[in-house]
Structures are given as C-alpha cells and as structure tokens.
Amino acid sequence: IPAIKTFDEVQQKIGSDKIQEAMESIGISMNKENIGLASAIGGWSYGISPLEMAGAYATISNNGLYTESHTINYVEVVQTGETFNIDEEIQNNAKQSAYSKASAFMVRQVMLDYTKNGSGNYAYVSGINNVGAKTGTSNWSSSAKNGMAGKSRDLWMSAYTSDYICSVWMGFGKEGIDKGKTTSQYKAYPGKVVQTLLNHLQSKGSQKSYPDQPDDVEQAAMVKGIYPYVSPSEGMSEDMIIQAWFKKGTAPTQSVDS
C-alpha cells in the first residue's frame, strides 16, 4: 500500500516526534494518538474532526500557511457597540506549517489533476473549477461483532478551492451501530454533500487565485509506474510518459535505459 510504504520511509528518516510536530502544525491534535503505520490509512485511536481536517486542507491552497479553524467572524457588544474582529485577529496570527510553499504547491497540483480526471466519487466534484479533493474510508476490524467485521465504518470527503474548504464525515452513532448499520450502501453521500456545498459557495465564481508556482519547483518528464523515478528514453511511447512536479535539483536524471 503506497500510503503505508511512504509513511514507513518518512518515519524511519525523521522519527515519530517530527511526524507529530508536522501534524500539530496544521491543527491536528495528537495528544491521545499513538503514531504507527496504521496512522497512514486512518488507524487512529480517536481520529480527526471535520473542523481539524478542513483547517489542514486549507494549508494546501494557502502556501502551507495554517490559520486556526474558527466559526466566528466578529463579536459586537450591544451595550457599547464595541466590535471584536475575531476572524481578522486569527488571520493576522496565521503561522507557517511544518511544510514549505513548494510542498503545498506540489500536493495541490497533484490533487487538482486527479480530481479533475477522477472517477467514482470524484466525479461529483470534477466539474467544479479548480477543486482538489480526497475521499476516505475506514472499516471495522476483523474482530468486530454483530456481523460488522470488515464492513465500512465511516466515510469522508474533504475538498478545497482557492476560496473555500469543506470536509464531510459520515458515520453512525451507537444506536445505528447496534442495529448493524454500515456506510457501505451510502458511499456516494459525502461526495454529493461536498458537490452541493461548493456549487452553492462558488455560484458567483472564484474570488481568489491559488498562490503562484514557487521558484524552487520545476516540472519534468518521468516514466509511469517506475520507482525510484527515471526519465524517459528517446523514442519511448508517449503513453508511458507523464509530466510531474519536483523540487529543483530532485528531478530524475537517469533514463530508463541507464
């Protein structure tokens, strides 16, 4: 599984403490979590709230800059007319997350591409201008009771545009779980909700643009399906070649024939 393989490589290189710091830098509470390989595919003790997830996704469209998630714009004191601009204060206190502008740009471009050309639940949002999205599913363990073993436990879709972020979670409370309900038959619902929200919010078009490409990022050709990455050889079929984003100096230099 690519996510687990990547997580394992990163964990071995920088350690669990650095991973925890990176997660906390984008607003995800890690106080009660034990970081391990299962974390890469949703194996969390307590999990992430939609509010935390939306705040984390906002960094992708905002150059890696983290702004604390909040639901209050301002507070006005009726008796005095005094106004406290909560949103303005939080925006002014935004902090750079653990990852760079270059990383945010590359993640954003990859997500925009596969969302635009995606199938399944991505089809619900693929027609929205400049949208990037990711779905998520977790299943009950093989030891779960009441016939729940291996069945779908909850569903996600989180998405962003240059203006808005939304994160939708779907699952059942104890009563539904006790009745044996699973999310298996409702897989399309998060995508439909995200589609409805963004279509409404974006009905007048985009107000902002994504940040420009950083100077330390470049695009280069590489061969599909080969890792470590290699550059295409002369005369290779175009079907085997894709354009990918790299930090400058890290694009593949060896060809597939080397």
Tell where the protein language model's regions lie, with residue ranges.
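Active-site-adjacent helix/loop patches that line small-molecule binding or acyl-intermediate pockets
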Residues: 1-30, 34-62, 110-113
